């Protein structure tokens, strides 16, 4: 369903000023996409060559948000608002069934849960060892991540994003910071 939801999404931009910041080749590709679909303007899809440059370069925050929200809700209960009402593309029940089957498989093979089964052929001895490793790793990494986050937020404010960084701003702000 993810591919169906990805393939079905097209956002048409009709105002060229909404494309400010996008590289010329991305704008040309969007114009070609629109033309191929019999549309006028610039058509953006959720395929990565179309989607990611918008996240990375588009100064239009609303455009970044629209594509971001459509991308992260593909094949979910939120898909219909972006996929022409195709609620049959919702993978929620498929995911629930997959989790149930994994749990059933683990128990049939004598494990407490799927995590324990998954760890059987791996270096970690058990789930608690993995939890301990991840907790320790998070404690060690947090100060560095916090420093980077603070730097990114400060830079975002200098770009006029005074209300904070939203998920659809991350690639854009990071790219701008990298260019500085």
How would you describe each model-predicted region?
Residues 1-46, 97, 101, 107-180:
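Active-site-proximal, well-structured secondary-structure segments within enzyme catalytic domains
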Residues 85-92, 98, 108:
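Recognition helices and adjacent regulatory flanks at domain boundaries
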Residues 35-80, 170-177:
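Active-site-adjacent "gating/activation" loops or surface patches in catalytic cores
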């Amino acid at each position: 369903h993810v591919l169906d939801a990805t393939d079905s999404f097209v956002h048409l931009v009709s105002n060229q000023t909404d494309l400010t910041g996008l590289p010329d080749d991305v704008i040309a590709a969007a114009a070609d996409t629109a033309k191929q679909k019999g549309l006028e303007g610039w058509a953006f899809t959720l395929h990565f060559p179309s989607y990611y440059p918008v996240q990375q370069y588009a100064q239009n925050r609303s455009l970044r948000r629209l594509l971001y929200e459509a991308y992260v809700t593909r094949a979910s209960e939120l898909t219909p608002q972006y996929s022409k009402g195709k609620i049959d593309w919702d993978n929620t029940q498929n995911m629930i069934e997959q989790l149930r089957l994994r749990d059933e498989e683990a128990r049939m093979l004598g494990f407490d849960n799927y995590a324990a089964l998954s760890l059987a052929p791996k270096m970690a001895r058990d789930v608690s060892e993995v939890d301990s490793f991840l907790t320790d790793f998070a404690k060690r990494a947090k100060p560095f991540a916090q420093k980077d986050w603070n730097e990114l937020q400060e830079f975002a404010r200098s770009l006029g994003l005074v209300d904070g960084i939203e998920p659809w701003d991350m690639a854009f702000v990071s790219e701008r910071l990298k260019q500085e």
